[in-house]
Amino acid sequence: TGLKESIGVITEDAPIGSRTITASLTGVSAGSWVCLVLGTPELGNTNDDVINSELSPYRWQDIKVQQGTTPNIKTNGIQIFEYHQIEKISGNSVTFKEPIMHAINKDWGWNVHKFANYANVGVEDLTFKGHAKEKFIHHGSDIDDGGFKLIDFVRLTNSWMRRVNFESVSEAMSITS
């Protein structure tokens, strides 16, 4: 995931759309990339209020499942990952270049993690020709599902692809954090 250990806890609420959070962070400065994490990189937050806020206007208790079972969203919880570049830090006030996408409730256990990434990676002016199978069978073989997956952008920031053509491929490109 590119996420390092937690470098601080968010200590004040922040509304959706805000560009500033309150947290005492270590080892980062203006220009650094971080990830706001609710839950942990490994485990989800199973608090009813947290889950229901993500499902609003619905509630996890309203999810219809087989009698006697608990929905996965309650059993496994939810994880939220928001990636941001720091614009400035002043004391415990951390301002991002872009607004946050979730309302921050300090009581829910939001943490800040360093985000290991690569920047300014680009692919331009190329044509990729595969040899995808004519008769596709979902999960039929490795060739069916990913044999001609050509580009995988992983943990990239400020990166691009332009004037690139793909012919006879099963998956041209993936972008993951």
Where are these regions (language model features)?
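Extended acidic/polar, glycine-enriched regions
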Residues: 75-127, 131-133
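Short glycine/acidic-rich loop motifs that flank beta-strands on beta-rich extracellular proteins
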Residues: 95, 132-139, 149, 169-176
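Right-handed parallel beta-helix
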Residues: 119-130, 157-170, 177
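C-terminal effector modules of nucleic-acid-centric enzymes and ribosome-associated factors
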Residues: 64, 71, 83-85, 105-112, ...
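Autoprocessing Asn-cyclization modules and mimics
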Residues: 1-81, 89, 95-97, 102-103
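Low-complexity, polar/charged sequence tracts that form flexible coils or short amphipathic helices
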Residues: 78, 115, 143-144, 152-155, ...
